[in-house]
Each structure stands twice: as structure tokens, then as C-alpha cells.
Amino acid sequence: MLKKAAGSALLRDPQLVKDILTAVVAAVDVPVTLKIRTGWSPEQRNGLDIANIAQDAGIKALAVHGRTRACGFKGAVEYDTIAAIKHTLDIPVIANGDINTAEDATNILAYTNADGLMIGRGAQGNPWLFQQIHHHLEHGTPLKKPSNQIIWQVLQQHLYGLYDLYGEIMGPRIARKHVGWYLKQEPALRQQFNHLKDPLHQLDFLNHYF
């Protein structure tokens, strides 16, 4: 994307962002949304300017990842910037970045006053995060963590889906990354699993663990 001057590279060219968004909004009759970062680099933070351009172009909702492109996923998330964008815009603003627990979600919503949350890496290996967040927002208390039995049931469905979609050769290979998210607290087990090439061997290995 960056080599083609697309994606977050566009943050360096606000006029081009304006032209693209205006053209897209005019070309379709469905609501158009946008996701941005806070800028190209810490020295080139222009997320607020881009957000205003987006709203003026007719964007109906804006998701903001609270880091610059140069920061990647490292460093602290700029929740202050997300809050400033939310304060300035009239359209819904969705906060994104380091939402890993229900408590994170509650605190980020309160701090930024965002209209919603966009969750990515925090849900990898933890699809229960959404239910946990909903419960915490509704009741103010943490939801009990899923049992190993429930985790195994969901993981089996995940694996069977991968095998069905990608086949018996590529399926197990792709499964290594996905299972790694579930086993991120168990690096030794993850390493053992990564040597397994057969679907049945993978399932048997995980069945013994869970």
C-alpha cells in the first residue's frame, strides 16, 4: 500500500485525501466511512486536519487508530488525539488501539467520549472479548473467564473452519498462526504445535492440552 502511495501514505497529502473522499462519496449512494491514524509520523501529526477534511467531504463515521503510521503498533496510544477529534467532529468517532480488556474498553470510552470502539488484535485468540466488554459496560463488573472446555469448543470450530476453507495442506499451516493467538501465554506449547502438519495431530495435541 505504501509503495503505491495508498493507505496511510495518503496522510502526507491532505489535498489528495480530500479529492479521493469527495469523489467516493459522490460516486456511491451508501454511507462512506473512513479509518485513519493520527498522522504519518510523530513529527507529522495531522489527524485532526484529516478528520475535518473527511467530515467536510461527507464521510459518515470516522475510526481513529491512536498512533502514527511510523509508530506502527509500538508506543502509547494517543487517546488525547482521539478525544480532540471526537470533540471537534459532529459525525461518530470510533476509537481504536490497544483495547485488550473490558476495562480498557470502559476507560477508553470514558476518556475519549468516542461513540464506539474498533477492536482488532485484542480479539485474536480471545473472541470472548466482545461479550466481556458488553458485560462490563452494562454492569460495571468483570465477566467470568471462559472455561477450558468452552475455549476448546470454540477453537475446534475455528480449526475445522480453517481446514475446510484451506484444505489439509494449507489449513494446518495457517492454523499455526491462529492457534498461536490462543496459546500466546504458552510459548513452549505453541512451538510444539508449530511442528504439527496433520489436522488430526493438531486436534489431538490441543485436545490433550485443554
Region locations from a protein language model:
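Glycine-rich tight-turn/loop motif centered on a GG-T
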Residues: 1-16, 67-79, 141
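Active-site beta->alpha loop and helix N-cap motifs at the rims of alpha/beta catalytic domains
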Residues: 1-32, 37-44, 55
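General secondary-structure edge motif
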Residues: 4, 34, 65-66, 159, ...
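Alpha/beta catalytic cores of nucleotide-metabolism and tRNA/nucleoside-modifying enzymes
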Residues: 19-22, 27-29, 43-61, 73, ...
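Ser/Thr-centric signal marking residues that sit
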Residues: 33, 68, 112
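A cross-domain feature marking catalytic cores of carbohydrate-active enzymes
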Residues: 34-38, 66, 95-97, 121
